């Protein structure tokens, strides 16, 4: 029977992939500093460098929070163990090819005297790995030798047990992913490790104690996770937990012992849960039921420690987590629910342990506590967000939203906003593009969540469902970035510095790299890892008028020993797992920006064009270029030699100063006089604390000297313009940033760029026309009321005082949101004029299509932005055929009322529907439940806009009839 199940494949896919700035926690352990794919040896998504901000994979971004709770591993690792330099062996490293050449005796002797990470391609599937692991005799030799060493290890010598277990874990990891090794993925084969595990456990030195003993205990748990367990192996493990509990005050600050008991709990839980899913059995039908009470009781002791400290909080959380999951194997099957309910009442409301308990009751016990009371996770999560993130700030007409803790100052938020503008300006200059590659994605609105502290950031796991063993995390699927405020004692980096890095990742996803993170060929095999991380470190050095400069803090990460520095080849092919590559990837891109801009530009052009083949070839050629590597090394030495001359860019106080009023007309006049532009256009934007402007136009330069020289000339010119503006009387010019895009050469052989300026707007007293939103187009039936909406119409410097609708059939209305009935079929032009309190008017037009008979959906309507607008009491026909998997509809509810939604599945295909309210596009307001061929639900609707997704989940084709009443 296969050890891993279908659901575990999902669990593997939701492992977080690190994509972002360095955080400020303990150094990554030796175990973590390995090629990133090695960290997925457990299909549970927990083993990754804690110092990296994560950017999660496709599955985690797609699954709902509730689904992630069910399939993901939400246990919490203890703090990382400080890295210790490995003892140098006879040979620095070995490959699987080297191991294949050895006879059995040579193999076991070698494995016994090296560290597992000296095997360079362990956990990587290649022909050598396949040959090695398909040799059943060799596998048995390793298992037998592990048993021998397990029975003979001492408190001072672990006999290389960790290396043997890692080689076996690599076998099962590769077998899970590759059918060529499928025999190793059978539990019957993995059970062959049980005698070795028992030999280890029967050794009197199998206990927590010295570092060697702790290493063996950890290896025991990890091997169970990837191989298998039985009753006896679990019973032996209970002795380890009891020893830890009995010596809790002594052991709680010992990271190796913490890691060891975590590996024991996680490994056994993972194996047993996997068995349930694969065998399709209930807990009371398994060998463990009623026979591992001792192990579970020790976990329960951890769950109910009562006194939570920063040092033991991770342990308490894990105790609650595993007590819930394993409680059903206790001789008292309600024990898990009893313990988790006790924990919920024991720990402070809305604390981390409290949330873990609530989640487990929701996930494993249908939302009912031990007394039968309903536990409403959604309501509690909402309370948590209100407590930990009570403040909201909006900028740029709502396109940037900050949600923060109450201790994150308003000044800090303003500085971060202006820092984003400096980074954005330099970023667009370099890539030459400022148009979203895929407009309509969630990142049309960037949401930035900032907790008060690293401690409160841990609640992000409970409030939003994402990993917190990082310095922050950007979820491209939702356009949301999570991080926390920090003190100088907690970090050598400021929040602004880290924010600049992460904001660059947002820009990359929106303007540079096609598709969502992790999807598509360009993301495969970590092609972009070196580029995206180094790129973010590079642009964190953006300035207003001095281009992009190296940061002193990142230079400090380069080795003082030239022999220890990365080569260009190693940098270009760097992968997650080592922290150093961030620094060297920055240095390479800084070098290219400064000395080989054409090369830098070509790399980005290939990425933006999604040209995987030529990107691979170009990267390969660069990696073999000795001149590039030589100059790269010299550039790094130059940075190190001049490190004290650099600083860390941060926004100036000028951004926060009070600036005198000045009309935007006058601003535009002065700016276009300083930099002559054709077709200049001034636009005002609204933010919570202030308004801003963008001034766009086309600049024509001198006769072209080639794109690279033209770019340098333009960058110099724009910087000079910014400096000239800053010398003028109005201080607001010191907030202006600028970029230029869309390079071309005109018919006169002169280069041209589109230039965009951004700065503070202080045009107080100048009346602006209102914004009108007609919310069309509309559809309806003859002699049935059609609801027209003016939602979104606004006047930023006053209020709208009148509305005038012209329905195109000779009739009008002055209502804000009128209902109109058409007498004849046809297409009508509808106009809406709004007037503000100072007399200015704005007009917008749309169409309404009126049909005699039933309505039919209009494609495309696959996304919320394309949704077909329907009214209440509407029936509409639709189809899901071929690649058309989803139809989206939208309707408005003016006041609270009960709504019936029904979809008639006319062909019996696999389909359903879900409904979201505009205020929460992540969680369902309602969802369809099958009733024969109807998929229906009734719910009480609050006022607002709703989005209804009708979708199929198989390959069937069919039509349906949707009714909303």
From Swiss-Prot:
Annotated signal sequence range: 1-30
Species, as recorded: Bacillus cereus (strain Q1)
Gene3D superfamilies assigned: 1.10.390.20, 2.60.120.380, 3.30.980.50, Collagenase ColT, N-terminal domain, Immunoglobulins
UniProt-listed CDD domains: PKD (cd00146)
GO BP annotations listed: proteolysis
Boundaries of every PKD domain copy: 769-850
Any one Pfam family match given in the protein's UniProt record, by short name: Peptidase_M9_N
Organism phylogeny: Bacteria, Bacillati, Bacillota, Bacilli, Bacillales
Localisation per UniProt entry: Secreted
Disordered as annotated region, ranges: 842-867
Catalytic function, reaction form: Digestion of native collagen in the triple helical region at Xaa-|-Gly bonds. With synthetic peptides, a preference is shown for Gly at P3 and P1', Pro and Ala at P2 and P2', and hydroxyproline, Ala or Arg at P3'
Propeptide position ranges: 31-93
Residue numbers spanned by region Catalytic subdomain: 376-645
Cystine crosslinks: none
Cofactor dependence: Ca(2+); Zn(2+)
Name of the protein this chain belongs to: Collagenase ColQ1
Domain of life: Bacteria
Region (Activator domain): 94-366
Entry-linked InterPro entries: ColG_subdomain, Ig-like_fold, Peptidase_C_arc/bac, Peptidase_M9_N_dom, Peptidase_M9A/M9B, PKD/Chitinase_dom, PKD_dom, PKD_dom_sf
